[in-house]
Design a protein with these regions (language model features):
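Primarily a LysM-type cell-wall glycan-binding module
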Residues: 1-19, 42-69
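Second-shell loop/turn segments in exported
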Residues: 12, 54, 61-64, 138-146, ...
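Intrinsically disordered, low-complexity Ser/Thr-rich linker and spacer segments
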Residues: 42-57, 62-63, 83, 92-109, ...
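Glycan-recognition patch characteristic of GH18 chitinases/ENGases
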Residues: 99-192, 197
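A cross-family glycoside hydrolase active-site/sugar-binding cleft signature
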Residues: 111, 132-134, 164-168, 211-215, ...
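Solvent-exposed loop/turn segments at secondary-structure junctions
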Residues: 114-117, 136-140, 169-174, 216-220, ...
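Substrate-binding surface in catalytic domains of secreted glycosidases
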Residues: 140-147, 223-304
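Active-site groove signature of glycoside hydrolases
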Residues: 193-224, 274-288
Length: 304
């Protein structure tokens, strides 16, 4: 695997010739569609197929996978143009083995709205280890705000992807409320009710883990929040269900700001089975032009 950075005058075909790779494979692995416009500075993923097969009449993905000594999930990963569909046709060329395998394991997870395009999701799930439908909120009484997540759970199950219940401060009115979170964190009985409802929903729907994302809590609620996370973990642990806590991207313990002060890295890390650094909050629609997650900024958070 390598990364090629587009230079002035490059085309998909000139890059393919220079790298000894069919332009069609470049397009396939980078989600490019005709007329294959490229931007100077754009990074292209370069993967070299080591083995391919031409689909014959009567072939299915299952039969091709068996003949190639692989599985259908791997075929989906090596052939993103399939978009998770099992529809193939005679004469189609499928990759059954890449020249270079991944050198180290990676865990890939993501969030998805319930109305996400099925085609988009099917194209992504073969590469994912976990999927969190976005999002479950809660009422002032500690009940979960319902979410139409059945379709996403079915797709995750079909692709062998672990479903995570995402818990946030969403209200029944559809807005995120730090005030409602504050009321919860100051009421131990309400926390017990919410924890029980979370567990019940996870067991009923087949969720295999919990991802908690409470933001803009402020310094005063940092320790109560960590205690709530510990309560959730203690509730889930007997059932073998892990808890992940989303952390705001901090670079120092004293970093000012309501978003950062509410997340005590040490306390939350101790109370959680795993943490997710939300290092995707820099580049956004209404901010200055930049990458969603600039490498330098991400590195500073990880090093802290």
């Amino acid at each position: 695997m390598q990364i090629y950075v587009v230079k002035p005058g490059d085309t998909l075909f000139s890059i393919g010739r220079a790298l000894g790779l069919a332009p069609g494979f470049l397009a396939r692995y980078n989600g490019l569609q005709e007329p294959y416009r490229l931007a100077v500075g754009q990074s292209l993923l370069v993967l070299y197929p080591e083995q391919t097969v031409t689909v014959q009449p009567g072939d299915t993905l299952t039969s091709i996978a068996a003949s190639a000594g692989t599985d259908v999930a791997s075929l989906y990963r090596m052939n993103p143009n399939l978009s998770g569909s099992d529809r193939i046709y005679p004469g189609q060329i499928l990759v059954t083995q890449l020249e270079q395998a991944a050198r180290r394991p990676a865990v890939v997870s993501g969030y998805a709205y319930p109305n996400v395009s099925e085609r988009v999701l099917r194209g992504i799930l073969p590469y994912a280890g976990a999927l969190a439908p976005f999002t479950y909120g809660f009422t002032p009484e500690g009940a979960l705000v319902p979410m139409d997540d059945e379709r996403l759970l079915a797709l995750a199950g079909a692709c062998g992807v672990q479903p995570l219940l995402h818990l946030s401060t969403l209200t029944a009115a559809g807005a995120f409320s730090a005030a409602q979170a504050a009321a919860l964190l100051r009421d131990p009985a309400l926390q017990q009710t919410l924890a029980a409802n979370v567990l019940q929903t996870m067991l009923e729907k087949g969720y295999e883990g919990l991802d908690v994302d409470f933001e803009y809590l402020g310094r005063d609620l940092a320790e109560p929040y960590a205690a709530f996370i510990q309560l959730l973990r203690d509730t889930l642990a007997p059932y073998g269900l892990p808890l992940i806590t989303a952390l705001a991207p901090k670079t120092s313990a004293a970093q000012p700001g309501t978003l950062y002060e509410g997340h005590n890295y040490a306390s939350l890390s101790t109370a959680s089975d795993a943490v997710l650094l939300m290092t995707y909050e820099w580049g956004y629609t209404y901010g200055p032009p930049m990458a969603v997650a600039p490498v330098g900024a991400v590195r500073r958070v990880v090093e802290f």
